[in-house]
Amino acid sequence: MNDLMGAATAPSMDIPAYRETLARSRRFLDRAIPGLEIRIITADSTVTAAEAVRESPLDAALSLVLVDADGSGLNTDPFDGSLPEALDQLADGLPAALRATFSAHSTYVYGITATAESLAAAQVARPFTLRALPADAWVLAADVICAFTDHVQLRHTGSALRAATKKGPSALAAALHDFLGRQPRDAADGPWGLHYYTGSVVSGTIADLDRLAAATGNPVLRGPSEHSLASGALARWQLDRAPFVIVVTSGMVDEFRGTLANLRDARARGFIVCADTPPEAWFPFQGTVHAAEDSRAVLAAKGIPYVHLDDPEHIAEGLADAYAQYHAYRGPVFLLATPAVLDATGTADELNRPGAVEPPARAALQVKENDLDPVLRMVNSEPSRLLWQCGTLDAEESWLVHDIASRAGVGLADSLTRPGSVRRHRDGTVVEEYLDTLGLYAFSARVHAYLHADGRLRPRDEQALFFLKSRIGEAATPFSPRTLSRQLRIVQVSHEAAHLAPYADHPVHADARAFLKAVREGLDVAPEVLDARKEAIARTRDSASDVIHELPVLPMSANYFFQHLRTVLEELITRHGYTYTGVFDVGRGGISAVRNLPRTGPGFSGWYGRALMGDALQAVPAVALTRDDNVLAFIGDGAASLVPDITPTLVQQSALYGRRLRQNVTVFRLIDGGHSVIRTYHEGRTGAEASRQTQVLSLLEPEWTRRYGELTVRHQHITDAAQTDLHGLLQQRATVTFASVLLAHNNEGDGLSLLSSLGWQRDELPELTFAMARAAR
């Protein structure tokens, strides 16, 4: 280095670019730090380098670390841990004073294998600068001079800026971490998670939360966009009741799409920290609250609780308000925080008031006797078919539901928005009372046969629908409000009075657990009633109710593909104890998967709430990286085209951050070249052929397999399910498979509309089918 900084240069260094680099470096160093002495230590390894530094008698700052990776036998592959481990050894071996000056921006790693081609294979910011070893000595010399001078200027002239920044941990980060860690949770609930997308003003808060969360074992979950953070948080809340902290930078309050409304509707508990600009800012860059707009009005209009934190002296008061809203179960609480608040330092003890942190006592909402009596009469003595559609159930609620269903002959159904709340396979046994799905789409042939006779709903006094923990939104059933109010008897159980539907004949305002316990205690079902109900359930057929699921035409029909996948899953579940979490995006593929595939537990459905295409796909990383079983995702080409690629997120968190996949992740991308549900609607209503508005162009990649550390990622084509090893595909551990499934559009089956129940392919055709055909002539 001393030679490089000297006046004389070898002939090979007499290059204008090198001379200019050297001149500008000396111009700065000679006047900024006159008399600067540079000392160079060379060693064969990072361990011996640390020993040599410790033996040095001089006090110094560690300005630059240059590593010859190939000469040291270190691998520069980002998914190989040898190089970071070696640098950690160097840091650990340095004296404390020098360790404090050892930084990523002053460490340069050179390796012959670090060619442009190898760098292009996978690029990620590293805790050092990676360079290909230049072929020309002057390029290496100039690069070293730039690195050295950059470090000196940053260390010395940047000290004033660093002195002005906060010293100590972020008060907001410490308070939120402490608050969430002190909230009681059931054993089955997931730990709260940190989700963030970086930004300048929130970078310090994120860094502190990242460190604190990692120290307590809370998952840190990244995503390719702000929207993906909300999708992942929603999925974890619905599947595992896991609270969350989402952190985004200023101006990003509108980047969560309709998923924010879904978080509100799900009563998801968590905080969304969104940076704000200083109050005095004039038309700020990426502003949130300023003269031109006030995002608080948008949040208020959406019914999203928020707290504006703009004074470091009043953070505790603002947090007390935020904690009260968290405990109120109104959905996520927005914290709009100015830079002064984000930069404020402090401890959780200083900010978290005991009365605000502890959740208030909440008595269970008991069922009233006058609400329970008509329900018990219906369950115990009326010879009625009973179908219960269940929302999300905890372990005790699930046990109560299944016990009541078995003892009272109650049919069970899950829904398009909450698939797997009840299911065919539970704890290794088949649930005889489960009749598959009831929903706006994806309603099963068994459910239809149970509720209908000769193509029409059975008489009102012969059956009743129970909706447990449901608002009975439009997506819950295929029936119109008129049908629900006039042709069906409805019992609805909800702990929120505002969710009780106007057409519920027996609205029960109570907690589900209290209701179920009361029903179970009052069970006294007449034997003849129980026998009749069980016979009614047994008479329904577990059938695809079409013929095209057997036809091996290419491209495949969705019916054919899902029938093969269903057979494989049934075998894996019943013979090998296979379990999985299903993730279902908005589209025909998600509908077909919900309707046709056996489930082993609750899944996440993009059909929930706003039914946003792409939500389910964006949630896959958060689900896959935090659950213990396999993950199967069903994503249409329309949904995939709307949102970012999740592959880098999965690879980064699994291979780089050590958040290993527990089992197998398979993402089925179902490609039929269009928005299939819209096309079915359009063709059914108008009889017209598909128009350009429903077309989706998919540019199919070749098949490939790549290794990233211990993680295998594959892309595979599935053109014929019968010729594909689906058994092997679903059981490859520590593997992410993106399977492009080539399909042809059709309008047949899968509960796409009530009219589909009159299609000619059904197992049984009611007279109504022929009457409608004759009337149309």
Model regions: which residues?
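Glycine-rich, anion-gripping cofactor-binding loops and their flanking helix/strand elements
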Residues: 71-73, 77-94, 227-230, 234-242, ...
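Glycine-rich, acidic loop regions that bind phosphate or pyrophosphate groups
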Residues: 115, 119-123, 274-315, 339-341, ...
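Conserved thiamine diphosphate
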Residues: 129, 242, 286-329, 444-451, ...
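Phosphate/pyrophosphate-binding active-site segments
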Residues: 148-172, 333, 480-585, 692, ...
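Conformationally flexible catalytic loops at phosphate/diphosphate-handling active centers
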Residues: 155-168, 217, 293, 299-302, ...
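N-terminal cofactor/phosphate-binding cores enriched in small/glycine residues
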Residues: 165-262
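Active-site diphosphate/adenylate-binding microenvironment
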Residues: 168-210, 538-627, 775-777
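Thiamine diphosphate
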Residues: 215, 279-291, 422-425, 591-777
